[in-house]
Design a protein with these regions (language model features):
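Periplasmic/extracellular loop-to-transmembrane helix junction in inner-membrane transport proteins
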Residues: 1-53
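Alpha-helical membrane-protein architecture signal
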Residues: 15, 34, 38, 42, ...
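Transmembrane-helix boundary motif in ABC transporter permease subunits
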Residues: 50-80
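Generic hydrophobic transmembrane alpha-helix motif, especially the helices
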Residues: 77, 81-117, 124-125
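Transmembrane alpha-helices
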Residues: 108, 112, 145-178, 205, ...
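Short cytoplasmic-facing helical segments at TM-TM junctions of multi-pass membrane proteins
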Residues: 118-163
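Hydrophobic alpha-helical transmembrane segments of polytopic membrane proteins
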Residues: 188-223
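Short cytosolic juxtamembrane segments of multi-pass membrane proteins
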Residues: 225-240
Length: 240
């Protein structure tokens, strides 16, 4: 039942568990070595941010290529859509074969989930760039690189930022899947380990930290998106 402390730890137990995890740590992952909430959070955050950064770099590059080259897009986009629609959980056995049980597997799951929304949104933004401005750029002798930098990419920024917000959520899912299903050290692995041993309060602490982490990442990207939108609005008002 909902009042069962094993199934639903009361707030007082969760607070006590958080204090112990922060101050002393607890033995976990089948080892006598104590792990603290800080070390678990840093491990997960490190994998999340590094994987997300890699997805931004590769997602932007691939998105620009697909947005500027229609033939390449016709060939590649069905594969992109298939990867986007495939649940990452079913790829876990293959990822273990490719990368083993370690840091690289964690990074790959984050990258795989986060890069595809960035690719899709960047490609859409590139295609929706204003053709009149592009024609003006061609008429004054701008190179492809100059067009991308000064004309096309500025117009695609709102699409890219929207893609980053979606990607952030998928990156969080990727890091948790990686840690839980590959039994990796981190908040996700800690939730699985503690839950299996009916230490519900400890598991709830890790769940709450993951929720705060995800909300902070997505909210910061949303703030960046709104700042850019207000800046563009001011630019248009000055032009008129």
């Amino acid at each position: 039942t909902i009042t069962d402390p094993i199934l639903f730890a009361p707030p007082s137990r969760i607070v006590e568990a958080a204090v112990v995890l922060i101050r002393d740590g607890v033995p976990a992952f089948g080892s006598k070595r104590l792990v603290t909430l800080q070390s678990l959070t840093w491990t997960t955050l490190n994998g999340l941010l590094v994987g997300f950064a890699l997805s931004i770099v590769t997602g932007l590059l691939i998105g620009v290529l697909l947005g500027r080259h229609k033939r390449l897009a016709r060939v590649a986009e069905p594969y992109v859509d298939a990867i986007y629609a495939t649940p990452r959980v079913v790829l876990t056995p293959l990822i273990v074969l490719w990368f083993g049980l370690g840091y690289n597997a964690r990074l790959f799951l984050v990258w795989l989930g986060a890069s595809i929304p960035i690719v899709i949104n960047t490609a859409i933004g590139i295609r929706n760039a204003r053709p009149d401005l592009e024609e003006v750029g061609h008429s004054v002798g701008m190179s492809e690189r100059q067009l991308l930098r000064h004309v096309i990419m500025p117009g695609a920024v709102p699409y890219v930022l929207a893609g980053l917000r979606v990607a952030a959520g998928r990156a969080m899912i990727g890091i948790v899947i990686g840690e839980m299903f590959l039994n990796l050290v981190g908040l996700g692995g800690f939730i699985r380990f503690e839950g299996a041993r009916l230490r519900t309060a400890n598991a709830f602490v890790a769940v709450m930290v993951l929720g705060i982490m995800g909300a902070a990442l997505i909210s910061s990207l949303g703030l960046l998106e709104s700042k850019f939108a207000s800046w563009k609005k001011e630019e248009r008002s000055r032009e008129t």
